[in-house]
Each structure stands twice: as C-alpha cells, then as structure tokens.
C-alpha cells in the first residue's frame, strides 16, 4: 500500500529535517556513549552467535497531545501550552527527526551484525514494516523507513486511511463477561494493596499535588466553572465494554491527560522553565509527573487477564513473525498500550528504565526481540531489549550511531531461564507466546 496519505506533508517535513541534521552533526561530537545491549556484546558472544532476525514492536515518536487547547487540557491551567508543530494527536516535527535517527541507527546496527550488507535494499520477504493506521503511527513508520532504507524506494503497510485504529493494534476487549469484569477488577485492585483502587491513587498524591501546582489548577478556568479544582477523586471508576478499550473516570484519568501533555511539552520545549510553565522542576519532579502515565497504563492494560485479552492479535502476529524463515526484520508501529499489554501478557518481570523520565514505555521506545543462532550447534535463542532514546537524546536531538547508541535495557521473562549471555531458548519463548494465546482462549 502506498504511504503518501499522511496528513503532514512528508516531503516538506523531510526538507526541514535535512537542515536539522546539518546542525546536529556538531552536537554528536560532544555526546558520551550510553549503554546499549546491542553494542556491548562481548568477543566471546560474537564468536559463538550470529544474528538471524529482529522483530520490533515500537511506540510512535513525539506527538502533540491527544486533546486540543479547547478541551479540558486548555481549561485546566492558567498558562498557555506550547505551540505544537502538529495537530492534536499527530506526530510533531521533532518526532519525525528523532524517528529518522532511530531508523538510521537500526540500519547501522544490523549492518554491523551482518544481517544486511551496507547499501543493500532488502526485498519484501526480508523486511516487514507495518503501522497502525493513526497519523502518528503511519508518520513514525515513514520517518523510520526513510532513515532505515533511504534509497530503496520502499513502501510500508498500513491497513486504513489515517486516522483509524487497525484491529491488530487496537487494545480493545474482544471478550467481556461478568466473570471477566470481576477478575479484572480483582487484579487491578491488587495493585493498590489493601486499599485497592483508592490505594493506587494515594500512591500518586505527591504527583497529583505537583501537577496542581504546576498548572495553577485552583485558579484555572475549569475551576472557576466549577469543574476541576483539585485531583482528589480517588474512587476511579473502571469500565470494560466489548469492542472497546478499557476505560476509566476520576482524577487518575484527568491527571494522565495533563501529565501526558506536560511530558510532551518538556520534550518539545528546550527551555526548562518554559516547559514547566515558569516553575523550577527537577528531574525527579518530571519523573513524578511521568509516574502518573505509568500507573494509568498499568491500571488499564497490565492486569494479566486484561493484557491477555487486548494483546491477543499482536501476540499471534509477533509469534508468526518470529517463526518466519524468510523474514530478517519486522517493524510494527503502535502505542505504549501495545508494549504494556504484550509485556504483561508474556509475563515480563517488573522493570524501571534508567536515563529517562518515562520509566516504562518512553516515547518512541521499541520492544526488540532478537533471534540469535549458535554458530556451532545451529540452536536458536531469543534476547529481548527495550530500546529507547534517553531524555537527553530526545530533548537535545542528539545524533545516534554505533558509538552513541540509544539506551537499551535487557528485559527478563518471569519463569524462564536465560544463559550467561541473557539469551532464552527459542522454544521456551515461543512456548510463553503459546501460553498467553491459550490463556486468551480460556477467557469466558
């Protein structure tokens, strides 16, 4: 399918990107290397294993907030939000620049590992790039591909004209019953300990207080209209509707909308004080704001029975890609909800990412399944890493290369044993996919 139906004018934006890169070359000279699992393989590892395939589930890159300035977002503060370079929910210019750099890095890494020869244009059997049909995901795939294979004149796939959710990426519930609802609420309540849902909100009180202060909520138009003056509704109401995403009402939802916009503004606005509406915020403060987003995502998509339900189409697709003989590289572009539900359905261990204010699914982050083969025995293994641009790389538009890679965090799968190199037996990982797929079939 042709990919010229991106609402932003791709060719126009690419011209601007070239001017960005000419300036960014100088910046790369001053960047200290960050830890990357892809780039830190030991000589012993390289002597024994060769890379055979990579399957990536990516979150889109930086977008404008989902809500416009005339929504609750514009009324909840006395301050003016930044002037976004895109319409609500769409990929920003900065997001395009950053994703192009990610595409360039991934190509250099795969060439360095011998998966592709330098300058080689892979065929459609070898490379599969597939995006959800929202503008921000289609544009992310376009920019990634322009960095990954700039001279190959390749098309990538998206099912619908933007913007519409593709069932593969739509984290909707396809099985709902009273039994399912009861189990989902039980698992979600457990996240808050003995106080359940209220306990979840109480754990965020410091974050709520911070957002109220930063936005000057008590003096906002929303407060004056008698709507929202404080984030004090701790009785989050959850709804599970067949064919729709899990949803909620209460302060956690409102706080997530604000936190999402603040974090995106922090990435877009280079002036720290302007990004914080004139406040002096520390990195820890930004982490506390971002924590709201992490908890919000966990409440909606991390409960085992919910994750298994909403991630089912992606689990089937990812498993098929990992088992494809011809495929060398798969790049799927979706959302943070996709990464959250897939990692929880597969029972990944709890984690907190370093060098980023977003500790779970940073903007533009990629869940990377690497298939390695033992050169001697031909036995196959899987390594899983979460690859992401650090907060500094995002805010300073730092160039990526093999000497200055994005951050890479090695993920662990609960109940599976990795070898000394962090590799899992291929059959064990496929078995975990089968377990999650079977668990979906058991949902009533």
Residue spans of the language-model regions?
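Short beta-strand/loop turn elements enriched in aromatics
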Residues: 19-20, 66
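N-terminal leader/targeting signatures
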Residues: 16-17, 26, 41
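N-terminal secretory signal peptides that target proteins for export/translocation
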Residues: 1-17
């Amino acid at each position: 399918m042709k990919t010229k139906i991106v609402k932003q004018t791709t060719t126009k934006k690419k011209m601007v990107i070239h001017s960005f890169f000419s300036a960014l070359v100088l910046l790369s000279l001053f960047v200290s290397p960050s830890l990357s699992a892809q780039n830190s393989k030991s000589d012993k590892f390289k002597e024994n294993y060769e890379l055979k395939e990579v399957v990536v589930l990516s979150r889109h890159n930086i977008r404008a907030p989902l809500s416009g300035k005339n929504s609750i977002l514009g009324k909840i503060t006395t301050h003016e939000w930044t002037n976004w370079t895109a319409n609500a929910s769409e990929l920003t210019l900065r997001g395009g620049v950053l994703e192009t750099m990610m595409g360039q890095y991934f190509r250099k890494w795969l060439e360095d590992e011998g998966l592709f020869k330098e300058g080689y244009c892979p065929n459609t059997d070898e490379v599969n790039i597939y995006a959800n049909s929202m503008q921000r995901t289609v544009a992310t795939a376009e920019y990634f591909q322009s960095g990954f294979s700039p001279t190959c004149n390749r098309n990538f796939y998206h099912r619908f004209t933007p913007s519409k959710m593709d069932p593969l990426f739509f984290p909707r519930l396809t099985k709902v019953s009273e039994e399912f609802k009861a189990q989902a609420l039980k698992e979600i309540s457990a996240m808050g300990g003995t106080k359940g849902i209220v306990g979840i909100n109480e754990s965020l009180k410091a974050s709520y207080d911070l957002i109220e202060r930063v936005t000057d909520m008590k003096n906002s138009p929303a407060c004056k209209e008698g709507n929202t003056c404080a984030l004090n509704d701790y009785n989050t109401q959850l709804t599970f509707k067949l064919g729709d995403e899990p949803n909620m009402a209460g302060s956690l939802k409102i706080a997530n909308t604000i936190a999402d916009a603040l974090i995106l503004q922090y990435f877009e606005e280079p002036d720290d004080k302007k990004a914080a509406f004139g406040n002096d915020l520390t990195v820890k403060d930004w982490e506390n704001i971002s924590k709201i987003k992490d908890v919000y995502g966990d409440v909606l998509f991390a409960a085992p029975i919910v994750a298994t339900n909403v991630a089912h189409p992606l689990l089937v697709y990812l498993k098929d890609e990992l088992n494809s003989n011809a495929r060398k590289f798969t790049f799927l572009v979706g959302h943070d909800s996709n990464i959250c539900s897939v990692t929880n359905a597969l029972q990944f261990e709890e984690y907190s990412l370093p060098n980023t204010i977003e500790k779970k699914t940073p903007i533009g982050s990629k869940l990377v399944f690497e298939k390695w083969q033992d050169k001697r025995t031909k036995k196959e293994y899987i390594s899983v890493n979460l690859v992401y641009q650090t907060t500094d790389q995002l805010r300073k538009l730092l160039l990526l290369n093999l000497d200055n890679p994005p951050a890479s965090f090695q993920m662990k799968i609960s109940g599976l044993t990795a070898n000394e190199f962090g590799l899992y037996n291929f059959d064990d990982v496929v078995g975990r996919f089968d377990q999650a797929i079977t668990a979906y079939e058991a949902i009533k």
